[in-house]
From Swiss-Prot:
The keyword Nucleus applies. It comes from Schizosaccharomyces pombe (strain 972 / ATCC 24843). It is found in: Nucleus. The keyword ATP-binding does not apply. This is E3 ubiquitin-protein ligase complex slx8-rfp subunit rfp1.
Length: 254
């Protein structure tokens, strides 16, 4: 488009947009590097080792054993310990209740707490055996326990009888001594002959008993424990036990 000079416009200052070429488009160059993932070599992973047939059988047997040991046996044992014979077994209905069978066979055992350690361990071992080898235990609990409980029960009762027979009650106390007292009884220390437990001193008001069955105040007990052997004998007549050994005296708390 042309302009005449009468318009007062300088022709050299007019831009002809129809004939000028388009300005070049500036492309923005990213500052980040472009990574070609196809050019990166793949990591090499070692192949799994080939197990021998024996190792495969061992692994398969171990997996089967872990599957055959369900958690309900452990939870059943825990419930049995806390709840006693009221808990019913979680196995199939054809299996008899374990604690119920024990209670019927031995009425003395009303709960697990009354079982001896050997009988309790027998129950735990049986439950562990059933979990590991379920195919070997087809309702044979009665036969198993009937063969094992009688011997264990006899051992348990015989040990109680031996304890009862070997126990010898102590003889009557000597004159001036007692084994039962009340608030009105005045007890004195065999060494200082002062009342026990009435002193305002914290050390002297403490009570110390001896293996020979006598009670000293805290001050006299400290002297006897730290004295030489010849001077550490119990001062009760016809006693003479040495009281300076490690476990000859212990403090009583009241």
């Amino acid at each position: 488009m042309q302009f005449n000079g009468s318009n007062g416009i300088d022709e050299s200052s007019v831009i002809d947009l129809t004939r000028s070429p388009s300005p070049p488009v500036e492309t923005s160059i990213s500052s980040t590097n472009i990574i070609d993932l196809d050019a990166i070599p793949d990591d090499s992973f070692p192949s799994s080792p080939v197990l021998s047939p024996r190792r495969r059988r061992m692994n398969r047997r171990r997996n089967e054993r872990s599957r055959n040991f369900p958690s309900n046996h452990l939870s059943y044992l825990e419930d049995m310990i806390y709840l006693g014979p009221q808990v019913s077994t979680r196995r199939s209905s054809s299996r008899r209740d374990l604690m119920g069978m024990i209670a019927r066979t031995f009425p003395e055992f009303s709960s697990v707490n009354s079982l001896s350690p050997s009988l309790f361990q027998l129950i735990v071992n049986r439950m562990r055996f059933d979990a590991i080898h379920p195919e070997w235990t087809n309702g044979s609990d009665d036969e198993y326990f009937s063969n094992h409980f009688e011997e264990s029960y006899d051992d348990f009762t015989s040990s109680l009888e031996n304890i009862k027979q070997s126990y010898k009650p102590p003889g009557p106390p000597k004159s001036g001594f007692t084994r039962s007292f009340n608030n009105d009884t005045l007890m004195v220390c065999p060494r200082c002959q002062e009342p026990l437990g009435t002193s305002k001193s914290k050390e002297k008001s403490a009570l110390w008993a001896t293996k020979c069955g006598h009670v000293y105040c805290g001050s006299c007990a400290k002297v006897l424990k730290t004295s030489k052997r010849s001077q550490s004998k119990c001062l009760v007549n016809d006693c003479g036990r040495y009281l300076n050994t490690k476990n000859a005296m212990w403090e009583l708390f009241y």
